[in-house]
Design a protein with these regions (language model features):
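N-terminal active-site segment of His-dependent metallophosphoesterases
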Residues: 33-107, 180, 186-187
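Acidic, His/Gly-rich catalytic cores of divalent-metal-dependent hydrolytic chemistry
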Residues: 254-280
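Leucine-biased recognition of intrinsically disordered, low-complexity hydrophobic segments
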Residues: 26-31
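His/Asp/Glu-rich metal-coordinating catalytic cores
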Residues: 87, 97-257, 262
């Protein structure tokens, strides 16, 4: 597949989909390796990304885990810390809604501040970027290690030290939108895309009763990204036709894992699932 940069080919070895074309569950701790041939010279080190979504931080009274509405966030942060992640990606619905009170937002902010790594957040359909969204009221955009698409950055977050760009379209209201519209021109060695919405396989794409926030194989392929971090589904799943490594992480509560994505010095993209670490 031709990249925006030029001489790029990705070789993938996908096993056949087992979900009627809708994708395939990631095997527990399974390994997927995607090889790029974009550069002849290796990077000095690997880049380690942790991808999660649909944490649904909520008021304590509505929460499991002993009544801690930030428990899923705490577990994901602990896991990212344990695997020494360079960057944590939260692909939508980090918060249950935009009506959460100050106490739970303050606690979530403290947990994010205590992280020893950058966090990139994509607002989803539960927590869209509104004038009084949780991101604005909670002051999350002021946290030095937190980048929020649609708040601190309009569309893309650069990481020059890694020659990496992470881009995505935030939900800005409660209406329908195209999560993968307008793919960005590649300007860095590594490019990761984020989207929060519903993957629809080719055989059902024409269904007029399909959900909102839809994208399919063509939109995925058009990103030409090295990895597409997806949110909105509670189950971890690989989707698409293989042109781009596109994965739902699933929610921490149901999946009990995060996706571990390693952008290797040799140019490979290695995707596995990592069990949630003991909360700390």
């Amino acid at each position: 597949m031709a990249d925006h940069v030029g001489n790029f080919r990705r070789r993938t070895a996908f096993s056949p989909c087992s979900q009627g074309g809708a994708g395939q569950d990631l095997a527990p701790l399974g390994l997927r390796v995607y090889r790029t041939e974009r550069y002849s010279s290796p990077m000095p080190t690997d880049i380690v990304l942790v991808h999660s979504s649909d944490l649904h931080v909520d008021e304590d009274r509505a929460a499991a885990h002993g009544g801690d509405g930030t428990a899923a966030l705490r577990s994901v942060l602990a896991t990212a810390r344990a695997v020494r992640a360079d960057i944590l990606l939260l692909a939508g619905d980090t918060f249950e809604n935009n009506q959460l009170g100050g106490a739970i937002l303050d606690r979530a902010g403290r947990r994010l501040t205590d992280a020893s790594f950058p966090v990139v957040i994509l607002p989803g359909n539960h927590d869209p970027v509104l004038a009084q969204s949780v991101f604005v009221r909670g002051g999350f955009g002021k946290l030095p290690n937190v980048s929020i698409l649609g708040v601190t950055h309009n569309e893309a977050v650069p990481f020059p030290a890694f020659d990496l760009e992470i881009w995505g379209h935030a939900h800005r209201d409660y209406f329908n939108m195209a999560p993968l519209r307008g793919p960005r021109q590649r300007s860095t060695r590594w490019q990761v895309a984020m989207a929060h919405g519903h993957y629809e396989p080719p055989e059902t794409r024409a269904n007029p009763l399909r959900p909102s926030w839809v994208f399919g194989d063509e939109e995925i392929a058009a990103t030409a990204a090295d990895y597409l971090a997806l949110g909105h589904w509670d189950r971890p799943m690989r989707v698409g036709n293989g042109a781009v490594p596109a994965y739902y992480s699933g929610s921490p509560d149901l999946a009990e894992t995060v996706n571990l994505v390693r952008l290797t010095a040799a140019g490979d993209v290695v995707v596995t699932r990592e069990p949630l670490s003991a909360e700390s």
